[in-house]
Regions:
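Short structural boundary motif marking the start of a folded domain
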Residues: 1-4
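Short beta-strand/turn micro-motifs composed of small residues
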Residues: 7
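Short N-terminal binding/cap micro-motifs at the start of the first secondary-structure element
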Residues: 11-15, 41-43
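Well-ordered beta-strand positions in beta-sheet-rich domains
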Residues: 17-19, 115
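Glycine-rich beta-strand-centered segment in the early N-terminal region that forms part
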Residues: 21-37, 47-92, 107-110, 122, ...
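A short beta-to-alpha transition loop/helix N-cap that caps and shapes the active-site region
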Residues: 42, 90-95
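Short, compositionally biased
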Residues: 95-109
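A short glycine-rich beta-alpha junction/loop motif
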Residues: 115-123
Length: 131
């Protein structure tokens, strides 16, 4: 599959298209075929090096796609479900805490990829009338 990796923070010209294997979801993860993604301001700041991220990071925190595989412990999703990314994927409920405030695309790989294996709680159901 193809994915865009940021070779090194410092500008949008630092992206490179790479070929990697389709990831296998862990027991608490789902595999998503990414149908749409977008570059938002947070992603731009990571690409420019204004928000720290690792060399080789796969950016993009906004996406929509279809569940193509579910891990053995996944209970909330089925193959074929339409999902979209959540801004704070580690904040499930309750008051915000510092450890919840991580973004996909800066401290873990994001959606600039054809497929992503991600925790089942990192996405939400896409409204049926959205395309």
């Amino acid at each position: 599959m193809r994915q865009m990796q940021l070779e090194k923070p410092g500008g949008l010209d630092k992206f490179k298209l790479t070929e990697v294997d389709i990831p296998q979801p862990k027991e608490d993860e789902i595999l998503i075929k990414v149908n749409a993604s977008s570059l938002n301001y947070h992603d731009l700041m990571c690409a420019l090096g204004l928000i720290p991220t690792d060399d080789g990071r796969v950016l993009l925190g906004d996406a929509a796609g279809e569940v193509t595989e579910v891990g053995s412990a996944v209970q909330n999703w089925q193959v074929g479900d339409q999902v979209m990314s959540a801004c704070f994927p580690n904040w499930i409920d309750g008051p915000p805490r510092y450890e919840f405030l991580s973004f996909i695309g800066d401290n873990q790989d994001g959606y600039a990829t054809e497929y992503i294996a991600i925790k089942e709680t990192a996405v939400t159901k896409m409204p049926s009338k959205w395309s």
